[in-house]
């Protein structure tokens, strides 16, 4: 059997300015030492955001745990949300992670598209410049 924790009452959200990752539910399968995360990625910008669907990881305390599998599209259209599932199994060195559901998790993913560049505003006045001499054969 699996244990479950839902976050409807107090969502765990990792905010990255133009997008955020919200944990909806986490399931723990103890015999397999696997946690399955159900998360929502929300693009808050007007630009498409691309990410590596195989790059999900979770921070619990000071440690990072990398996904064993994911079901994710890899692209977030502007002003949209996407449901993603991914699993964490064991530790990178092959041991058991024994991660409890009560941890305060942060979800991370590797982004492919660069963040939007801020618009540059200047107060400089543009003055047209006349040529110093007239080109030949011109009045």
Label each residue range with its predicted role.
Residues 63-121, 126-139:
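Short, solvent-exposed, Trp/other aromatic-anchored flexible loops in extracytoplasmic proteins
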Residues 1-14:
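A eukaryote-biased signal for short, well-structured alpha-helical docking elements
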Residues 46-49, 57-70:
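Short aromatic-acidic-glycine turn motif
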Residues 36, 47-55, 95-102:
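Short, hydrophobic/aromatic beta-strand segments
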């Amino acid at each position: 059997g699996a244990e479950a924790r839902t976050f409807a009452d107090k969502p765990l959200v990792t905010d990255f300015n133009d997008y955020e990752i919200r944990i909806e539910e986490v399931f723990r399968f103890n015999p397999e030492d696997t946690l399955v995360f159900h998360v929502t990625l929300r693009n808050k910008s007007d630009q498409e955001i691309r990410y590596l669907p195989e790059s999900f990881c979770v921070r619990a305390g000071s440690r990072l745990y990398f996904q064993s599998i994911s079901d994710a599209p890899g692209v977030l259209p502007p002003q949209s949300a996407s449901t993603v599932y991914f699993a964490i199994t064991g530790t990178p060195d092959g041991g058991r992670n024994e991660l409890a559901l009560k941890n305060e998790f942060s979800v991370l993913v590797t982004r492919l598209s660069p963040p939007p560049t801020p618009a540059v505003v200047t107060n400089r006045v543009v003055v047209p410049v006349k040529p110093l001499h007239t080109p030949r054969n011109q009045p």
